[in-house]
Amino acid sequence: CALPILIHSIGRNRPGTMSAWIERRIFPGAHPPCLSEMMQIFEPHSFSVLDVENLRLHYARTLAHWLERFEANADKVEAMTDSAFVRAWRLYLAGSMASFTAGDLQLYQVVFTNGACNDMPWTRWRLYNDTRSSKEKTWNPVTS
């Protein structure tokens, strides 16, 4: 089995452009893809998608923690930069948190491989349980 590869990417539900403000102030040149755009890259190269997971609510919570810590240190940040920087990042963190919470932005994790990968668990049981004592077995149609 070829080693699986993980792509972890902020994305969106449909093709589109970034907000002009984010493009100009925060992430120049960034493009959060939708899943169909990601698949267009995989398909010509015969990559097999093994798993797709959306962690948008996890990321919304992460952004909430970042915003809380940013606010607790805003005076220090402003002393190192300026008030415009603090306002921009406050808006970015709060706006992003709202976008992930509302489902306008996504956080995709796509696992793929460049060949037949049959020696893998059937379920996600291993993700939610102690894998050191895992009762789940892998199923390989070639050897089973």
Task: Tell where the protein language model's regions lie, with residue ranges.
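Short, small-residue-biased leader/transition segments that mark boundaries at the very start
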Residues: 1-3
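Substrate-binding/catalytic lobe of Class I Rossmann-like enzymes that use SAM or dcSAM, i.e.
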Residues: 10-120, 128-129
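Short, cationic low-complexity segments
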Residues: 125-144
